Regions:
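A conserved mid-domain beta-alpha-beta active-site/ligand-binding segment of alpha/beta enzyme cores
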Residues: 157-173
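Active-site beta-strand->loop->alpha-helix modules in alpha/beta enzyme cores, enriched
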Residues: 1-23, 27-146, 151
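Phosphate-binding/catalytic loops
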Residues: 147-161
Length: 173
């Protein structure tokens, strides 16, 4: 298992997997952390997966991922079209995507939704992440939203002013 550090280590971070239920979940939830990691480990490969989208939002999601990932050495961006709000009912098909993903990549670090998130789609992705990637370092991100389900984080990543401004600029793009 990768030992997490924002500084240079004997074991450099090489592969990150980002999982988001909806367009802009990853950017809002862990975009600043990703920008910090990319600046520290530019030789990264990032797999960026968004599970719910439509044609217009898929274009926006891809453009946003491209902006956030412009500093990495390689990337794969996938946007699926699962129906928003129905992940619990599409769980078997989504699980099949996770099983294929497990065969395709072996990430050092995975970002997924917080397990206590009140949105059903977010919870499904969290459960499938922990079920599928049992021997990986998994960090959960929270998304501030109307139902106020921000918990007590066990990891806080300080962002520099420049990183914060970059994240905001990308989100407004």
């Amino acid at each position: 298992m990768f030992r997490f550090s924002f500084g240079p280590t004997a074991q450099p971070l090489q592969r990150i997997l980002c999982l988001g239920a909806h367009c802009d979940d990853i950017e809002i939830g862990c975009g600043g952390t990703l920008l910090t990691l990319i600046a520290t480990y530019p030789a990264l490969h990032v797999d960026w997966l968004v599970f719910s989208s439509n044609t217009q939002r898929a274009k926006e999601a891809t453009a946003s991922a491209e902006a956030f990932l412009q500093g990495v050495s390689s990337k794969r961006i996938l946007v699926f079209a699962f129906r928003d709000g129905y992940f619990p009912y599409d769980g078997m098909v989504i699980k099949e995507h996770f099983e294929r993903l497990k065969l395709e990549c072996n990430p050092d670090l995975i970002f997924t939704h917080c397990r206590h998130d009140l949105h059903q789609d977010h919870r499904v992705l969290n459960e499938l992440t922990w079920n599928t990637f049992r021997n990986h370092l998994i960090l959960e991100y929270e998304i501030p939203k109307y139902d106020g389900d921000l918990g007590i984080p066990n990891c806080f990543v300080h962002l520099t002013e420049a990183t914060y401004q970059t994240k905001i600029a990308y989100l407004l793009h």
